[in-house]
Amino acid sequence: VSATPIFAIDYKSAEFEVIGPRPIRFRMGLNTSVAIWLDELDAHVAFIIVPSGMPATMTNARTPGDGLRWLQDMLRKTRLQWLPVKAHVSDDEGECMGGVCVFDVPFALVDEWLMWLDQDAAVQATGSGYVMLRSHPAIRSTRDVD
């Protein structure tokens, strides 16, 4: 896993903006708006993945944007429901990173994406309103929810 622990701290403090017919912005922690939003979308769980690593299958990837394009291309070939995301990672500079929000995807598939994208974690939003990190399988702790 190549992302640094500092990136994980930034990830936890970021604000996530899901773009779509029912847009929403939220941070990590308990958020009843997330529970209502997921209920309106008839979804139980959402995972936000903001690629910062390079996909294992791309030997000539040059930027994190290459990882995002790879993930979007893969998602377009599935029947999974997903929306684009902006992760606002810095309040001071307005820095944003692109990502995706995928609904009701099996946990094992999220773990595969984390491994293929060389990501430390994904953001997991649940129907109870909890927004937390789901760690890469190699660094997973007992605090993660399956």
Identify the function of each model-found stretch.
Residues 99, 134-146:
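Short, low-order "capping/linker" segments at domain edges
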Residues 77-103:
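Short, intrinsically disordered low-complexity segments
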Residues 69-83, 118-120:
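Structural alpha-beta junctions
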Residues 65, 103-104:
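Short alpha-helix boundary/capping motifs
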